[in-house]
Amino acid sequence: MDEQNRALYETPTEIEVTAKDSLVHVGSLDSFDITKGGIKAGKLLLKYLDNGNEKLLHQAIKTYEKIIPDENFGGEYTALEWLCKYFLAPEEAKQDLLSKPLIKSFYDVLSKDDFADLRTYIQLKYHIVEVDKNDVETKRKLRFLEDFILFNNPDRERWEKTRENMEKFNIQPGERIADVGSGPGYFSFKFADIVGDEGKVYAIETNPMHLDFLRDHIKENDIKNVEVVVSQFEGIGLTEDVRVDTVFVCSLYHNVYAAFTDFEREKFVGSIRHALVEGGKLIIVDNDLVDSSELPYHGPYISKSLLTSQLYHYGFKLIDNYQFTPQRYVLIYEKVDVPSDFKGKENSIDDPCHIHVNTAGSLIRYRIIGTSTAGYSIRGKACGKMMYDGFMENDPEKVQKAHDMFAELWPKERIGDDYTAFMWFCEYYLADDNKKAEMLSDYRDKMYFDFFGGNDYEKLKKYLYIKFYLEHEEAEDADIETCFEYEGKDFPIGTLNEWNEYFVFNNPNRFLWEKTDTMLDLLDIKEGESIADLGCGGGYFTYEFSKMVGDKGTVYATEINKDAMKYLDALKDTYNVKNIKTLVTRMNDCKLKENSCDKVFMCSMYHAVYITDIEFVKDEFIASIKKGLRPGGQLIIVDNDVTDRFTPSYYGPGIMPELIISQLSFYGFKLVKKEQLIPQRFILVFELQ
């Protein structure tokens, strides 16, 4: 047993950071996982579907054979190559393949209506046709097809060694298995064959399209020992009386770790513990990072040490682990008592590469509450309805009450969300003319008000109504800790999210929760300096920096989201601001000229770099920062901390500062200052060594 594996068993709550690579990755914000070879082969397959020319299939297969080992190990390419070979196979061979139920269902889904879904998948996946940002249904369809083609791939054995790892699971006839996050049931139906008529498999899934496929496949093939279960964030969905011998979680726990709130994850893992018999097994299959240019990238991943350290605190003891390919591992845990006398060790920024995991909380989270929208809570909804009614009825008493309700609530939940912004609009509504003029004396605040408050608060009213889904009444017994989402279809989701970002980040009351003035003083920005605001959003800090550096200074405002940049461009043009230069960038390049900046500033962004950037993308991005910094220049990172369960958390993403400090140390940055003005927010200042 090597040293790393030994540590998983002997010191499960300690993590050694030994390289620049992130410990967890949940997927790219950009399309760097789409390769030229994949696009070429996809177009050849698409063209074959149109004209039936088999030469195109041979060309596609030749392309896939060249790129699969290097570009897309474990991805969709092996499935698409399988389809090409199927189309070329003799009729007898085709019939033999389709005699296998899962392969037949795979082909049936993709071939229906003259391969309509396969055509849609190739066109959207490889950006041959672009999907509208507000077309939620098409995006959901694409997500289903991505999962379906990836997971029910008839050639999955080729990259995963499925038979070998299933032997490691040691599933026995008669056992009861919960397949959590079953997707379209690849493992569920394999487990069903093993456990036999005396056993039972629960295929547990949240995606409605996967659920429909599972039910149809079970009905069509008269499968008696698989039961479909609808899961929610509150738990895996099994009824209180169901007990299972094994819970199986494949290609999911990286999301449980990084995308669930602590509350959601406690419910989720708690329901797994409840369902397992004493001594029952939790089997996790997930992706590992391969730090080698000779082996291809394989999508989301989570380090075994990060995963094991968390599950230790939930009462799961690692009893076996197996690396059946460099990119894929199996971890097998036994349900034991939850540690009751654990004594944690303090972490130190002086030794950031040695991390003590003292609780079950994640060291980083990425899910902004509400995955389709900005989301809302039950308590927030009550405040929002009071404010909406007050503005619609022009009732100062209700507006005042809404203000007071938000003022009481915002320190308790969703720090940094829009509650203090709602308070600002209530304050403006209730103010006299002199106070209103004072509140709009700042250019940025005037534009902010005009956008949401113009035409008798038209957009503000709409935002309140949609944000809190006021047309829909929540159940009276809804849990106040649960996050809800707007589910209506009469307002574009993309527009709502765009409004939400502008509403939150350019909030004139932002200083209430962030202590912005104190933060800006600590940054020591001088007149005449050049500063880059990376991921500037609506330009809140860009505008502040513009005032601080003066006419002789320059602020480079960079953003990958063109829609966010338009608010800043409008401010520049309307008020003739000369010292701001806007740059539309990509995740791998901040587009700064060499030695152009005294300071590079990133607010609420590095967590995304850490958890969503493919490693080579992160390498290139940080190299572009180093290129742009002048000798002696500083990299300043403001981000959201992960808090303990007794401290209200920032409403969206968060990251343990030690993860940033340790990672940047491998890129040659030395921490020179750390400040923590509030529990939910920290400032890190780095210089190149």
Q: What name fits each language-model region?
A:
Residues P12, E16, D21-L46, G52-H58, ...:
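Class I SAM-dependent transferase core
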Residues G174-G183, G528-G537:
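Conserved class I S-adenosyl-L-methionine
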Residues D193, E264-E278, F616-P631:
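A short glycine-rich, Lys/Arg-flanked "PGG" loop and its adjoining helix->strand segment in the class I
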Residues N207, N561-K562:
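Conserved SAM/SAH-binding beta-strand->alpha-helix loop
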Residues L238-V247, C590-V600:
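A short acidic, Gly/Pro-enriched loop at the edge of an enzyme's catalytic core
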Residues D245-F263, D598-F616:
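A short SAM/SAH-binding and catalytic strip from SAM-dependent methyltransferases
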Residues G279-D286, G632-D639:
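Conserved beta-strand signature within the Rossmann-like core of class I S-adenosyl-L-methionine
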